[in-house]
Amino acid sequence: MSTLVFSHPSNDQLDAASSEDVRAVHFVGSLPATLTGDHHQMMRWFLDHTPDTTLTGLPCDQDPRWIIDWLDGLAAIDALEPVRTGHSADYNDMPTYRLKHGRWLESDDLSLGRATHTDAVMAARAQLHDDRDFPPHQVSIPNPYDLALFTFGSPGAAVTHLPVFRQAVLDDVHTIHRQHGNHVVFQLETPAVLATLDRTPRPLWPAAVRALAKQVARVFADGPRDATWRIHLCYGDLGHQPLFPLTDLVPAVQFLNALHEQLNRLRIPMPAVHIPMCTGTDAPPTDPRFYRALRHLRRDIDVIAGLVDETHPTESRTALALAETELDRPVLAVAAACGHGRRLVPDAVANAALACELAHRTAVC
């Protein structure tokens, strides 16, 4: 069984697929709660619902609510005390913490347990059988700044404590890469980037964009240099609701171009990027102006278009054509705006079916 990595596909790799397989399908990672628990069955679900279609990766996320289980678990960390309690039913109901006086955090306190989870997933993966080659296992890696921000509830505290969160994340990444090498790809996941820019006045964007890009670049620089990454930008999807309204793609493009510049300076390859183009409450826009910023995206950035919305299939088809017209090239892959963890099972099935249809759709550019 061979391993295919699509973060930086060559033309030969794309041509190796069937002539109609213009794009791959990308899954952000999570599945509805009723489908989680059994690693083998979760991975089988992704394979069974994408027949004759290339996948960018094979995920197996354990928390359908992304980091909520981890966030709740921080209540047991002795160095922390709650500032606000909550059940995470929505963004106003999330717990936050502060450091107890005279205490400090260790990276082990903040571990997401990704290394142990990945070992279990890879053991289950070895029992999978399919006629096609499997893509690499996709490991969900929340951005350290996001973890710090959700923990403390304020940007200032998040920046202050960022180093220990970064170390906790990278401990897992290095362990996983050492154990599994190129059989895994890492997906850095961040709603905080776009949420921060949404809350920042546009005259201050240049400084904010540089700071955010520098933070993300540091993660890649301190990780294994031969690891394969991709990036998942996000509007948030707790309760299938976004953190902020959909406006345009200018923030995403400005951040990604700044990150590209930082990584180029460090001689680190730019990962493929999942850009959300709809939300749990907003259909993919059909106004061409929404996608216009994509013409300014660096041409060597591979785009995963997060525009597959099973409740708006016509708009999804239109959005794909508009996005590729502005990019002047086919996207690497199509995807939903976020994971399927907040969907009902029939909706997840419908989304996967629409993604496969769009993946095989003839490119217009």
Residue ranges and their predicted role:
Residues V169-L170, I231, V273, V334:
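Conserved, mostly hydrophobic/aromatic
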Residues N143-L147, T190-L194, Y235-G239, M277-T281, ...:
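Active-site-proximal loop/turn and secondary-structure-junction residues that shape catalytic pockets
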